[in-house]
Amino acid sequence: MQSTTEISQKGLNDMKELNIMEATVLTSPNPLTLICSKKEDGSTNLAPICFVSYLSFNPPMVGFATGKQSHTGKRVRETGKVIVTVPCESLAGAVMACGASTGAETDKVAANNIEMMAVEGSDIQIPVDTRLAMVATLQQSVEVGDHILHICQVDKFLGDEDKKGLYAWNGFGK
């Protein structure tokens, strides 16, 4: 019979070292969110982001990370407001297209024909076909490597459990 040490060593020997892109494949699928923020002209910007996590139950907190040069991150830091949404599968093509351009130069809502709706108590709109919306206020932003982590208190959760959310498969390298 093998000892615990021998079994542990065998398991370790079966593992190989990965880079972060390979590691993301092993944690897929991840909810693919659309970060909704207010643009300078008052319209809504949409940015697909998978670097999102619940951070606290009391108070309810959520965090998301954007690249340091991200227009979306800049707008959230300037306005202090954001709505983190989980879009539905019907928006898969539009969500991918939203990730291909910056909201600083493109009206992503119009360019991708995304039907939007108002959220009570917010001047930021969200896609009509949304499974979950977290209306939030920025509490803190922290530089983390090549990204900025936005730590937000959730003011209100809105959800439709009958809708099917969109997920990112096979990590972030595809």
Please state what every model-predicted region is.
Residues 2-174:
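Basic, polyanion-binding surface patches
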